[in-house]
């Protein structure tokens, strides 16, 4: 059990959250453009 507590105490959850938000923002741009292109809308 000590291994699990040491493992989780060493994880920097703030960094993981920031990288996750950055990835979501970076992915959102191309996704919007692809969805508009598939619908035939004006960009």
From Swiss-Prot:
Superkingdom to which the source organism belongs: Bacteria
Record-level GO BP terms: photosynthesis
InterPro entries named among the record's database cross-references: PSII_Ycf12_core-subunit
A Pfam family reported for this protein in Swiss-Prot or TrEMBL: PSII_Ycf12
Subcellular location(s) per record: Cellular thylakoid membrane
Its membrane topology: Single-pass membrane protein
GO CC entries: photosystem II; plasma membrane-derived thylakoid membrane
UniProt entry tagged with the keyword Transmembrane helix: yes
Keywords: Membrane, Photosynthesis, Photosystem II, Thylakoid, Transmembrane, Transmembrane helix
Transmembrane segment boundaries: 16-36
Function (record text): A core subunit of photosystem II (PSII), probably helps stabilize the reaction center.
Assembly notes: PSII is composed of 1 copy each of membrane proteins PsbA, PsbB, PsbC, PsbD, PsbE, PsbF, PsbH, PsbI, PsbJ, PsbK, PsbL, PsbM, PsbT, PsbX, PsbY, PsbZ, Psb30/Ycf12, peripheral proteins PsbO, CyanoQ (PsbQ), PsbU, PsbV and a large number of cofactors. It forms dimeric complexes.
Protein name according to UniProt: Photosystem II reaction center protein Psb30
Organism: Trichodesmium erythraeum (strain IMS101)
